[in-house]
A protein has these predicted regions:
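Short, high-confidence coil segments that cap the C-terminus of an alpha-helix
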Residues: 72-74, 160-161
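Proline/glycine-rich low-complexity loops and linkers
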Residues: 1-2, 6, 93-165, 170-172
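Active-site microenvironments of hydrolase-like enzyme catalytic domains
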Residues: 80-91, 162-164
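Gly/Ser/Thr-enriched, mixed-charge loops and adjacent short helices
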Residues: 1-70
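Short, glycine/acidic-enriched loop or turn micro-motifs at the edges of active sites
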Residues: 23, 82-86, 94, 169
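Short acidic, glycine/serine/threonine-rich loops at helix termini
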Residues: 28-32, 55-57, 87-92, 131-137, ...
């Protein structure tokens, strides 16, 4: 987590961020992380009781975050799944920003910082053609795996890549 925070230091200064923690793992840390990045955080579904994980909350019920962001006039929102290995974002209008767009944003950012190892992002065969076109325009290479974060991770380890993920919101970073 510390590594990710160094990549995004001060990048959320004064940004109004909604967080849907799905009453799961993110409940313990998400607010602290975004606060440390300078965000003004607004949190929902962060009271796990052992039974309510993912219950009408988080990335599998994105409409909850969409409404929360719009009703509170927030700048952006992030919804995690119960074990916090998946993240879906919404913009200020509640429009979904899926894993492909998140990969694009981080891939571009890492390339601009000279930190995109092997100039490559790992995706799955389910990624959108628009993502590949955008990577081509930026001169970023990509490798496609079978669907499943397991396969993305295996490719990253085998080939030494820094970032990979799925359209579903599983995003994986390595040092």
């Amino acid at each position: 987590m510390g590594y990710l925070m160094t990549l995004a230091k001060n990048s959320f200064r004064n940004v109004r961020v909604g967080l849907d923690c799905s009453n799961g793992s993110a409940s313990a840390i998400a607010k602290s992380v975004f606060d440390a990045l300078g965000a003004k955080t607004y949190v929902i579904n962060a009271e796990p009781d052992g039974l309510n994980i993912n219950m009408n909350a988080g990335s599998t019920h994105i409409e909850v975050l969409q409404n929360f962001v719009k009703e509170n006039q927030l700048d952006v929102g992030f919804a995690f799944d119960g074990d916090a290995d998946r993240c879906i974002a919404v913009d200020e209008n509640g429009n979904v920003v899926d894993g492909d767009l998140i990969l694009y944003v981080y891939g571009r950012y890492l390339k601009e910082k000279g930190a995109l190892r092997n100039n490559t992002v790992v995706t799955t065969i389910m990624s959108n053609f628009g993502l590949y076109k955008a990577f081509d325009e930026l001169g970023i290479d990509y490798e496609k795996t079978q669907v499943g974060d397991k396969y993305v991770y295996e490719n990253m380890v085998k080939n030494g890549h820094r970032i990979g993920g799925e359209q579903s919101g599983h995003i994986i970073f390595s040092k």
